[in-house]
């Protein structure tokens, strides 16, 4: 009997670890990525994607629109559950890395944009699925060491399998130590897991969603 498997995708971590450097990879078919990564003796019963909606940024004027197109594409393709956090803007005072001169002020007033709740939402979803006995195997796509606590709980208390696929190129020794199985995602793997350039939907396929040209 195949193991019931749920895949949890940390969108923020995946983006900065694997997708940001290659615009074409942003048009990623998350379901297909999960199917490629998960061993064949497992049955994927859910793929859960945790992300936050981008706020308008004059430095990246198309980012919000492109993300909305992508989220609609995922919805139309199906097979993905999306849970959203949010971005929070904060005024902050930060020190210069190097003091410019002895008489200069060593701090600058900056605006910090921080992604909130995605990691908490992911960890909470794992715990709920564990306690409701929704899965035998838990697969996490993230390099965030903050997830060690739920990983340990599910492994040690529940005696379930927890697999971590790290989207970053660097090794996360902490995650590797705590997971049942750990692997860094190959840098070229997203090229095999992209959505179609055009996704048709509607009763007769009369409507369509297109990959943003900047992501081609």
PLM segments and residue spans:
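Nuclease catalytic cores that cleave nucleic-acid phosphodiester bonds
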Residues: 83-216
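Domain-level signal for Mg2+-assisted phosphodiester chemistry and nucleotide/NA-binding surfaces
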Residues: 1-103, 107-111, 160, 166-167
């Amino acid at each position: 009997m195949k193991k019931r498997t749920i895949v949890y995708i940390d969108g923020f971590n995946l983006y900065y670890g694997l997708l940001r450097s290659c615009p074409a990879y942003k048009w990623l078919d998350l379901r297909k990525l999960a199917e490629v990564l998960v061993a064949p003796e497992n049955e994927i019963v859910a793929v859960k994607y945790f992300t936050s909606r981008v706020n308008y940024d004059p430095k990246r004027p198309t980012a919000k629109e492109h993300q909305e197109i992508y989220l609609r594409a995922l919805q139309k393709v199906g097979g993905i559950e999306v849970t959203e956090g949010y971005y929070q803007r904060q005024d902050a005072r930060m020190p210069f890395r190097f003091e410019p001169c002895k008489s200069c002020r060593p701090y600058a007033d900056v605006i910090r944009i921080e992604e909130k709740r995605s990691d908490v939402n992911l960890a909470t979803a794992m715990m709920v699925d564990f306690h409701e006995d929704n899965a035998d195997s838990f697969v996490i796509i993230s390099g965030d060491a903050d997830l060690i606590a739920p990983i340990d709980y599910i492994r040690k208390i529940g005696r379930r399998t927890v697999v971590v696929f790290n989207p970053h190129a660097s090794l996360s020794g902490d995650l590797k130590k705590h997971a049942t199985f750990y692997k860094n995602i190959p840098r070229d793997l997203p090229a095999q897991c992209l959505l179609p350039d055009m996704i048709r939907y509607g009763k007769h396929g009369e409507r369509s969603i297109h990959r943003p040209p900047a992501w081609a």
